[in-house]
Swiss-Prot record:
It holds the Pfam family FAA_hydrolase. SUPFAM superfamilies: FAH. This is Putative hydrolase BamMC406_5393. InterPro entries: FAH (IPR051121), Fumarylacetoacetase-like_C (IPR011234), Fumarylacetoacetase_C_sf (IPR036663). The keyword Metal-binding applies. PANTHER family: FUMARYLACETOACETATE HYDROLASE DOMAIN-CONTAINING PROTEIN 2A (PTHR42796:SF4), FUMARYLACETOACETATE HYDROLASE DOMAIN-CONTAINING PROTEIN 2A-RELATED (PTHR42796). Belongs to the FAH family.
Length: 282
């Protein structure tokens, strides 16, 4: 299934794409795509519904983040060896974990606010993993059983705040609008191997990132298992799993960063696309 949330910010309703790619309303069946609605049992109940029997959503509504009430938004750094190289950092022996504030979450097409004074706002297309079942100390072999599905994430990053100003990466990762998620939550049965998906990103039509999750340092299963040893993962938690090479700070001889008035387009095969305009934060 391709699940989504549509409507004004803060008033999103749950929906599903039908066979023709049209949005059907799910709000008579579930209040939101959040919490226990993401469990295997609840998703099985949604799967049993014929989308053609659901109300058709008219027009072109705003698409919100594909998960509601996210409890934890967990980032993984340097998870592609070639990205670590372009960043001038060693390939990690254990996952690099940081937090993205949930206040950074926005819809896939809502736009990116460049922070006041920023000249180093950067892009990162990433595979997002949405937890569906509470898990703690799970084995790698069973880790994917706890995943509800997958989505596109743009891990927007302000490199000066992330790298140059001391402290933790979190500072440069959590600005408002730095966490576009969606458009769809694609259930895990439709992504048989999360280590075999292509991901890409363009700025103003120029392709900067082309990658495949097969080159991850740590697989999705390894990340879920690892994280579950140091925290309890809960339904609706989102893990954004790292980016392939081609980010702005890695461009030689001179880095390239986002400016107001640009268009960012990114996507992952089978998971949909995002389209964002950049603007200066007010």
């Amino acid at each position: 299934m391709k699940l989504l949330r549509y409507g004004p910010s803060g008033q999103e309703k749950p929906g599903i794409l039908d066979a023709d790619g049209r949005i059907r309303d799910l709000s008579a069946h579930v209040p939101d795509l959040a919490g226990d609605v993401l469990s295997d049992a609840a998703l099985a109940r949604l799967r049993a519904i014929d989308p053609a029997t659901l109300p058709l959503v008219s027009g072109e509504p705003r698409i919100g983040a594909c998960v509601g009430r996210v409890g934890k938004f967990i980032g993984i750094g340097l998870n592609y060896a070639d990205h670590a190289a372009e960043a001038g950092m060693p390939v990690p022996k254990e996952p690099v974990v940081f937090g993205k504030w949930t206040s950074s979450i926005c819809g896939p097409n809502d736009g990116i606010d460049i922070p006041k004074g920023s000249v180093k706002t950067d892009w990162e297309v990433e595979l997002g993993v949405v937890i569906g079942t509470t898990c703690k100390d799970v084995d790698e072999a069973r880790a994917l059983d706890y995943v509800a599905g997958y989505c596109v994430v743009n891990d927007v990053s302000e490199r000066e705040w992330q790298i140059e100003r001391g402290g933790q990466w979190d500072k440069g990762k959590g600005f408002d609008t730095f966490g576009p998620i969606g458009p769809w939550l694609v259930t895990r049965d439709e992504v048989p191997d999360p280590q075999r998906v292509d991901l890409w990103l363009e700025i103003d039509g120029h392709r900067y990132q082309n990658g495949n999750t097969r080159t991850m340092v740590f697989t999705v299963a390894q990340l879920v298992a690892y994280l579950s040893t140091c925290m309890t993962l809960q339904p609706g938690d989102v893990i954004t799993t790292g980016t392939p090479p081609g980010v702005g700070m890695g461009i030689k001889p001179s880095p390239v960063f986002l400016k107001a008035g640009q268009t960012v387009r990114l996507g992952i095969d089978g998971l949909g696309e995002q389209l964002q305009s950049t603007r200066n934060a007010q």
